[in-house]
Amino acid sequence: MISVKGLTKSYGSTDAVRDLSFSVDRGEVVGFLGPNGAGKSTTMKILCGYLPADAGEVSIAGFDIFSQSLKARSRIGYLPENVPLYPEMRVGEYLAYRAALKGVRSRRVAEKVEDALQLCNLGHVQRQIIGTLSKGYRQRVGLADALVNEPDILILDEPTIGLDPGQIREVRSLIKGLATRHTILLSSHILSEVEMTCSRVLILNKGQIVATGTPAELRESSGLSLSGAVRLEVQVPDADATLKALPELPHVASASLVGRTGEWSTYEIIPSAGDPRPALFEEAVRRGWKLRELSARESSLEEVFTSFVTGGAAQVSLSEESRS
């Protein structure tokens, strides 16, 4: 649905985007991450036809954004970071006005407005003045605007910015519901929201893609699949002999015995490269140990993101085979 090849955009001597290439397939919800100044908003504005590019190709639902701009833009619903609403208009009349601007036929405007109101749970405020709405509801109006012409693709720039935790949960739930009907590309600084909402992540730094994949794939490729020690609680005949044997297992750097309760022994295991839990489980089965706990905290997406943008992890681009 979205194809970007060799995209470049400069502001004077500063490269905002450099030779950027990526794609988003039909039905995907893709998170677009990067530090401030990475080029996220510039890329999104180019995808929506708001900015020209210096070089490269952009295809939206099969249409070239530069030579077939109107056809391409008619397939896009765009929610900018700062939603430009008319505060003196009522919600319903604003959406009807926007539907007409987007080419919705007059006899279908009321139907499309009603659909957008229901999708965004705005039916009970459709006659309310926009300027009297809370930040969360204004964000919903912006999203309803993006949806009113039934686009194939939604491009959402910081859809939860400035919202309180309750409002963030509402918008997250709404985006998940929309994912069944639309291809979605969204950017956010709230990395936990991206992880809970998106099926795949693109990490942008200094105008270039430095990593792409599912959150789990990015953890693996960054070498940060686990954060901290693995805890193993087992019933073994000889706790000290087990302690000596554990470092011989794959992906175990070291082990320490941290507690004993009756016949149960608790070990803290420091991983080397990779995840030692499969090997630990297989060893417990092979030796007939009773297993009560085998746990570890996975690295957060924030830790993985920081690793990539600070150069702690090598650039990663997963193959189509690994994403299928």
For each of these PLM feature ranges, what is it?
Residues 2-4, 9-206, 210-211:
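ABC transporter nucleotide-binding domains
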Residues 114, 132, 261-262, 299:
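Positions that flank functional sites
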Residues 172-272:
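ABC transporter nucleotide-binding domain
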Residues 272-324:
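C-terminal coupling/interaction segments
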Residues 77, 103, 142, 220-224, ...:
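A generic structural signal for secondary-structure junctions
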Residues 121, 252-258, 290-295:
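A short linear hydrophobic-aromatic micro-motif
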